[in-house]
Amino acid sequence: MNATPEKADDLIVVGKIFSVHGVRGEVKVYSFTDPIENLLDYPRWTLRHEGKVKQVELVSGRGSQKGLVVKLKGLDDRDEARLLSGHEICISRSLLPNLATDEYYWYQLVGLKVINQDEHLFGKIDHLLETGANDVLVVKPCAGSLDDRERLLPYTGQCVLAVDLEAGVMRVEWDADF
């Protein structure tokens, strides 16, 4: 395993190691990619835990009932593998595939101000939830917000009118009383 990290501000979290598998140093991974196997397309990962980072190299991986089972180069022992439990798996943002003009990665939406059709500022996007039917924006109040309510807005074409990453704003069709 290599100790040379990527630039911290360039990293995007794409998964997390949550346990060990077997006795030969394999780890169980929860992937944030869709489909989950896409995580295996990145041969080098930066692991991050409690402010420390290190680079690792993927040897192999396969799907399992609760995620992925992964073998990392130089990790051959269950006890050593256990030390990686809880580590975030990161890659450089530059490795992510380009999206269509009207598509966004979740990390791009976090922090955007959310303003409705009546020019009411609801707050900023804190994070997103995956519900199965559609993704949900979790909007928390910020300075200048209409009120102090947390709002859950569907991330759908009916609700989201426009996204302006440069201005840091998402415009939505959503009643302030909802």
Swiss-Prot record:
The keyword Chaperone applies. InterPro entries: PRC_barrel-like_sf, PRC_RimM, RimM, RimM_N, RimM_N_sf, Transl_B-barrel_sf. GO terms for molecular function: ribosome binding. The keyword Coiled coil does not apply. One of its GO terms (biological process) is ribosomal small subunit biogenesis. Keywords: Chaperone, Cytoplasm, Ribosome biogenesis, rRNA processing. It holds the Pfam family PRC_RimM. One of its GO terms (cellular component) is ribosome. It is found in: Cytoplasm. Residues 101-178 form the PRC barrel domain. An accessory protein needed during the final step in the assembly of 30S ribosomal subunit, possibly for assembly of the head region. Essential for efficient processing of 16S rRNA. May be needed both before and after RbfA during the maturation of 16S rRNA. It has affinity for free ribosomal 30S subunits but not for 70S ribosomes. The PRC barrel domain binds ribosomal protein uS19. Belongs to the RimM family. Binds ribosomal protein uS19. This is Ribosome maturation factor RimM. It comes from Pseudomonas entomophila (strain L48). The gene is rimM.
